[in-house]
């Protein structure tokens, strides 16, 4: 790539879960592979300490003790970013795909809790990440076939008919802040 254009930036490989970053960086260094940035994806379920039998509803249900660490899923994403940034070293870090859940059909996507988690995650990670790309803009999503209906737990900021979800409004408010922090 660099032989075609010396100014082209190379990085990646943009896979889920941050744990591959040290091996990737080490491989590139050992083999003189140009590496200008790290791109990755993350979801709360990427955490290696995540209990696979647990659903996000457990963290936001009425039974949860609001003073417990379990309610702080935003802290998990922030912890993951801090670790990834450390492992990336001086390389810029890009999250080219992220959301509050990796599961299509997770009702959590459509709730105000999701917008609070997104807002706090963005605020907590300001200055650590070069860019965040939220997955995805609309519930029109082809990977598993289109599921009909509004507010059915799709990944998007909007429903299939363009109705903004609470997380859309969170991004809208963040945009209105401009550069003010």
Question: Can you annotate each of these PLM segments?
Answer:
Residues 1-132, 150:
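Noncatalytic carbohydrate-binding groove/subsite architecture in carbohydrate-active enzymes
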Residues 123-181:
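Aromatic- and carboxylate-lined catalytic core of secreted/periplasmic carbohydrate-active enzymes
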């Amino acid at each position: 790539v660099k032989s075609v254009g010396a100014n082209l930036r190379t990085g990646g490989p943009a896979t889920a879960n941050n744990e591959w970053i040290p091996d990737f960086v080490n491989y590139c260094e050992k083999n003189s592979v140009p590496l200008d940035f790290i791109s990755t994806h993350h979801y709360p379920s990427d955490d290696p300490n995540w209990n696979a039998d647990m659903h996000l509803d457990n963290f936001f249900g009425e039974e949860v003790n609001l003073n417990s660490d379990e309610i702080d899923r935003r802290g998990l994403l922030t912890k993951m970013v801090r670790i990834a940034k450390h492992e990336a070293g001086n390389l810029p870090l890009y999250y080219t795909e992220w959301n509050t859940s990796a599961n299509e059909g997770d009702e959590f996507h459509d709730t105000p809790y999701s917008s609070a988690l997104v807002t706090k995650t963005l605020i907590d990670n300001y200055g650590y990440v070069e860019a965040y790309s939220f997955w995805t803009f609309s519930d029109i999503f082809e990977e598993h076939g289109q599921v009909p209906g509004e507010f059915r737990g799709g990944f998007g900021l909007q429903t299939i008919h363009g109705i903004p979800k609470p997380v859309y409004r969170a991004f809208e408010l963040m945009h209105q802040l401009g550069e003010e922090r």
